Regions:
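Phosphate/oxyanion-binding active-site loops and adjacent basic polyanion-contact surfaces
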Residues: 42-50, 80, 111, 115-118
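A short, flexible beta-alpha/helix-coil linker loop
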Residues: 103-107
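Hydrophobic, Leu/Ile/Phe/Ala-enriched alpha-helical segments that form helix-helix packing faces
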Residues: 49-61, 123-130, 180-192, 225-233
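Charged, often glycine-rich, active-site loop that binds/positions anionic groups
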Residues: 71-87
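Interdomain/boundary linker segments immediately adjacent to catalytic/signaling cores
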Residues: 1-69, 75
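Active-site beta-strand-loop-beta-strand hairpin of nuclease catalytic cores
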Residues: 88-98
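Acidic, metal/cofactor-coordinating or nucleic-acid-engaging core segments within structured domains
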Residues: 109-210, 214-215, 219
Length: 236
């Protein structure tokens, strides 16, 4: 199955509905997290997106591949024992794909660096594990899908606090958090930390508002997955 723009748009709408449902359940239980955490700590808000991505690998199931996108799916690390990934596809001893799905809604100043460090660190750890012989002989394929809320906090120019001891890359000057995510994922893919990435901007409660960078769009992600599926089919 090849996912369309409309499929992703529907999955993003389900993302917002899932957040609202989880926040409601927490409120009814009387156990409410601070800020918007109650919308995400249930763990299901990105399930529609994960299921859509997993379905794109289903042609490999006919070959005996296993497609996982629910529950706990740990892969070995190098600097830590293991890390759970959102979508994992395996065929014999080949790690066909490992894909992470993340989002940021509000709290942009507080969480941007955390999201950046996660994206970089997870990839570095997995590639080092592969180099150490922990993930088979065939090169794995890594993907990252990120949903950022389209809101004033993500689209206005960041007023950075403090002056760095050395001059930062000027590409970050006068940029919003959404623009900084564009730079992050573009560089992660260009430098092969990830084989494909997708950055989606969405206003609260709606579908896709924008895909700010064509190189990290739903179309490019789908094309990259199609290429990976064809490669594994060729090996089989």
């Amino acid at each position: 199955m090849t996912a369309s723009y409309e499929d992703y748009d529907t999955a993003i709408k389900a993302f917002w509905a899932g957040r609202d449902l989880q926040a409601q359940k927490q409120s009814e239980s009387g156990k409410t997290d601070a800020g918007t955490r109650g919308s995400v700590t249930g763990g299901l808000h990105l399930s529609a997106l994960q299921e859509l991505i997993a379905r794109e690998f289903l042609p490999l199931a006919d070959l005996g591949a296993t497609v996982r996108q629910s529950g706990i799916i740990p892969l070995p690390g190098y600097y830590r024992r293991a890390k759970n990934w959102d979508v994992v596809v395996t065929y014999n001893d080949i790690l066909v794909a490992a894909i992470e799905c993340k989002s940021q809604v509000g709290s942009f100043a507080n969480n941007f660096n955390n999201r950046t460090e996660e994206a970089i660190g997870n990839a570095v750890d997995l590639w080092r594990a592969y180099e150490a012989g922990l993930l088979g002989k065939t090169r794995p394929w890594l993907g990252f899908v990120f949903v950022v809320e389209h809101a004033p906090g993500s689209t206005t120019i960041v007023r950075d606090q403090g002056k760095p001891l050395y001059s930062p890359d000027p590409v970050f000057d006068n940029s919003s958090y959404t623009r900084r995510y564009q730079i992050l994922f573009d560089r992660l893919v260009r430098e092969r930390l990830y084989d494909a990435a997708c950055l989606i901007s969405s206003a609260k409660g709606e579908g896709i508002y924008d895909e700010p960078l064509p190189e990290v769009s739903t179309r490019n992600l789908t094309a990259a997955i199609t290429g990976r599926v064809a490669y594994i089919q060729g090996l089989a």
